[in-house]
Amino acid sequence: GFTNISLDLMYGLPTQTPDDLQRSVHEAFALAPEHISVYGLIVEEGTPFAAAEAAGRLALPSEDAAEEMYDWLMAELPARGYARYEISNFARAGYESRHNLGYWRNVPYLGVGAAAHGYVGGVRWGNESNTRAYIRTMRAGGSVRIPEDTQHTRDNAMEEYAFLALRTAEGVDEEDFARTFGVEIDDVYRAVIQRYIALGLLRR
């Protein structure tokens, strides 16, 4: 059978209560997965959920209830042996997602197929999302890549490196930052770093 199973769970869903979430998570624990991801529902603009919310037809949990769910998850998952290694990801020792860590560490990856996304040479891109158009373009020898980094600059690359790394428990690898960009992180972000350390929001 499978020896490495990951489950994705969501909280803050319509009509969901903290008790509902706890029951779902305890059912997940009963399956003994090696990895669990938890995501809070975000109602994106232009979606059916956004339209339903605007019309008063979406019974989302209150802000207090959603916060209670989050706090419970952050305490319960580590208590059950799942270490938090990224904002939304928890794993038993040695079972951290290589895909997730690669993304947060800015490792290049290829996107293959319609609507796939890739990151190569410091540039992010997505493939044509319409399958018929994708196949037609490929058969004609054309490019299906659509660049996503319309303003790809060194400054943007450094910012992206930093904020992706800050999503992880390991944080920013200062030596790797210096190797990648040829400059010490303090020479670029010293004032920002000092400000957030003083606020208790960042530590070294």
Where are these regions (language model features)?
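Short, hydrophobic-biased segments on the C-terminal half of alpha helices
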Residues: 25, 193-194
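A cross-family detector of function-defining hotspots
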Residues: 190
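A short, conserved structural fragment
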Residues: 197-204
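C-terminal scaffold of the Radical SAM
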Residues: 1-183
